[in-house]
Swiss-Prot record:
Keywords: ATP-binding, Kinase, Lipid A biosynthesis, Lipid biosynthesis, Lipid metabolism, Nucleotide-binding, Transferase. The keyword NAD does not apply. NCBIfam families: lpxK (TIGR00682). The lineage of its organism: Bacteria, Pseudomonadati, Pseudomonadota, Betaproteobacteria, Rhodocyclales. HAMAP family: LpxK. GO terms for biological process: lipid A biosynthetic process; lipopolysaccharide core region biosynthetic process. GO terms for molecular function: ATP binding; tetraacyldisaccharide 4'-kinase activity. Transmembrane segments: none annotated. This is Tetraacyldisaccharide 4'-kinase. It catalyses: a lipid A disaccharide + ATP = a lipid IVA + ADP + H(+). It is an enzyme of class 2 (transferase). GO terms for cellular component: plasma membrane. It comes from Dechloromonas aromatica (strain RCB).
Length: 333
């Protein structure tokens, strides 16, 4: 409840709750600790180029679809990528490989989705440089690493930084917890590219090359019946529709369903939420729709008809051209 209240204050410019300013001392403390963390970090350089995908705001902005797009584009251009991630929400911090059969509570929901969708090696670890070393030892053919959600992990040296936003932009422009920013907007000046998931409500004040990303919905597929797919049109008149989302910005998923003509009773959950069967009981008399990230955690829990909506990132090829040019510069150096 508190997290949702804060997000409304951060991103709705019409809301100016005086209570928010009581958190200013915490914002100054957070900013100071963040600066100290970056100052004290000793970046570890890996033997292959590293592309970091992250954001300076809290919550989901589309990093995972972008990482999948990058893996696919790099492979198409002859590169052999691997992916490292912390694996938020998992039970341990140890370095380990992620396979399609891994358990989400052991590796994290996003790394598991990346392993199932990307077709490239995926490893997780609290210390991404150590995870990267383990991945490279196990897969010596890998010649570029993607670090998912690693912008603030300064212990890992990087060659390319990609910063992701969604249509909400930088919100009220304040640091946590007064606003949604992990780092100041001025941080964008040192990034290689800014990617906005959708048309931003306000332009970001940066001269860094910017690219728009759109998430194209695919066909729904059944969680409990392999190989069965359906269009949004075919689901409209099938019965009562419900939707859940435990992602950084659940409303984005619910708006996508609306854009497909699907009217649903919605249920948001916190990002990286660990589902239990009772969480899905609200949809027992109808059809439940969810994201792919939620589906990897709900296997075996669904009592009724459950469908998943996959999405695929679409971006200008100019972005991958920019990235490949920088990677080749690293090889020459």
């Amino acid at each position: 409840m508190l997290a949702r209240w804060l997000q409304r204050q951060w991103f709705d410019q019409r809301r100016r709750q005086p209570a928010l300013w009581l958190l200013l001392p915490l914002a100054w403390l957070y900013a100071g600790l963040s600066a100290l963390n970056r100052l004290l970090a000793k970046p570890k350089h890996l033997p292959v180029p590293v592309i970091v995908v992250g954001n300076i705001i809290v919550g989901g902005a589309g990093k995972t679809p972008l990482t999948l797009w990058l893996a696919r584009q790099l492979r198409d251009r002859g590169w052999r990528p691997g992916i490292v991630s912390r694996g938020y929400g998992r039970s341990g911090d140890e370095v380990r490989t992620v396979s399609a059969q891994s358990r989400p509570e052991e590796v994290g929901d996003e790394p598991l989705l990346l392993a199932r969708r990307s077709g490239v090696p995926v490893w997780v670890g609290r210390h991404r440089a150590v995870a990267g070393e383990a991945l490279l030892a196990a897969h010596p053919e890998v010649n570029v690493l993607l670090c998912d959600d690693g912008l603030q992990h300064y212990a890992l040296a990087r060659d390319v930084e990609l910063v992701v936003f969604d249509v909400r932009g930088a919100g009220n422009g304040w640091r946590l917890p007064v606003g949604p920013l992990r780092e100041p907007v001025s941080r964008l000046a040192s990034a290689d590219a800014v990617i906005c998931n959708g048309q931003p409500e306000t332009l970001l004040p940066t001269a860094t090359p910017s690219f728009e990303m759109s998430l194209k919905p695919g066909l729904f597929y059944r969680v409990d019946v392999a190989g069965q797919s359906a269009s949004a049109e075919s689901l409209r008149d099938r019965g009562r529709l419900y939707a859940l989302a435990g992602i950084g910005n659940p409303e984005r998923f619910f708006r996508t369903l609306e854009s497909l003509g699907l009217s649903c009773e919605t249920r948001p959950f916190p990002d990286h939420h660990r589902y239990v069967a009772a969480d899905l009981a609200f949809a027992k008399d109808g059809i439940l729709l969810m994201t792919e990230k939620d589906a990897v955690k709900c296997a075996g829990m669904t009592a009724g008809e459950t469908w998943v909506l996959p999405v695929q990132a679409e971006l200008s090829p100019a972005l991958i051209d920019l990235i490949v040019e920088k990677l080749r510069g690293r090889q020459v150096a």
